[in-house]
Amino acid sequence: MNTEFKKIKIAVIGTGTAGCLQTLQFSQELNFEYFELDWIYDPETPIFGIGEATTPHIPQVLRRSKFSTDMLFNELKGSLKYGVRFFNWGKKNKRFEHDFGVGQYGIHMDTSALSTFTLKHIENIEGTNIKVVAEKVKSIESSPNGCIVNGRNYNFVVDCSGYEPLLYKDEYIDSEIPTVDSAVIYRRMKPGKWNHTVHFAHENGWMFGIPLRDRQTWGYTFSSKFTTEEEAREGLQKLMPDEDVSTARYVTWKPRFASFLIDDNGVYARNGNAAGFMEPLQSLSGLHTEQITSIICDYVNDDCSKQLGNEAIIASEREWLEGLAYHYQMGSAFDSPFWNDVAERAKEFLKSKQCSEKDIEDIEKENPKDIERLALGCFACHDLLQLSHGLDTPTKDILGKWKFADFNSYGTDELWGAQDSIEDYLK
């Protein structure tokens, strides 16, 4: 990196989840004797706090930043997340759980509250040199000597500005497996009293349910290839007949990945939605963001080259895609155009992956102990076992021989609650 300034100057742009996580991670990993950090955001640009769920990786970032459980519950309006409950995924089981395991939990949080609290908290972290800059980014340039943002020079910039990045707007790769690309999102103003994320398959896609302390967020996701916004709103109303969902917000996105993480000049990177977005299934977007955050920290600390960083992000993107395909391969309880199309695409995509039925059979014959190291994308063996049983994949019996003989005890009603339908969650 170019270090012509007295201190290495870094800017993070944006205060969404990615901007918060990147700034918090920098606060932990940079030696501020040598770095200065500006966190730039436009106070006139609202953050749409839909309610967000995470994997177990994100709470570790918050813990290292001295966030307490009390802050999580009170400041972020959050709740603990022990896993994901699936309804109507696959052809066999009406309901199954993906449990994170003993001592592992994600969180549900209000994304706008995370932004507000982190902005207030960040400048008070001891031993840092972080300045919050409240202004709209009107100009940005990248060159071999650094970035210029609104006339100020920086050695490195992380763009967390959202779906529309500030530079390289066309440098993306379209998804190989188009799944859902739109959602109608409804806030139900009653506390969510459960500790898992809900993934409820419907004929046009699937719906997520996220519990916060003061409300619930329900998102009816669908593919614009098969379903219109009006049809999606009708579908949401059908699933929630006693709610007035007319206030539900419509959002859409193009499933895609960034073609690189760090630009050719080595001075600009993207994170969060600016680095690409597939869909919200299993909170994998948050995991992808956390991985990018770590790679960028390694890069600015000279622990990772530009080439390795870019290779790592491509690998992370492939893992995300593989994880999605594994969920969709068995279809759902619905014989509909969307599910038939996406299941066929997912099966075809997975034929070349390590978790294919033939590959697992080969591992079992040649070296059974390798089953323990089997993984697909971001899912380890114990995750695959739960998903394979719940989805009833062809590999479930082989996987089941090697781990979690007491699998059926996972996700007991005593821990998870006995909700058996959307109606049970809305009581």
Regions found by a protein language model. Give the residues of each.
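N-terminal Rossmann-like FAD-binding beta1-loop-alpha1 element of flavoenzymes
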Residues: 8-35
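N-terminal FAD cofactor-binding segment of flavoenzymes
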Residues: 46-101
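Long, low-complexity C-terminal extensions of enzymes
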Residues: 298-427
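Predominantly flavin-linked oxidoreductase catalytic cores and closely associated redox partners
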Residues: 121-236
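Conserved N-terminal helical subregion
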Residues: 5, 90-148
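Conserved FAD/dinucleotide-binding core of flavoprotein oxidoreductases
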Residues: 202-255, 276-287, 299-302
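Conserved mid-domain beta->alpha element of the FAD-binding
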Residues: 258-321
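Glycine-rich FAD pyrophosphate-binding loop
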Residues: 27-50
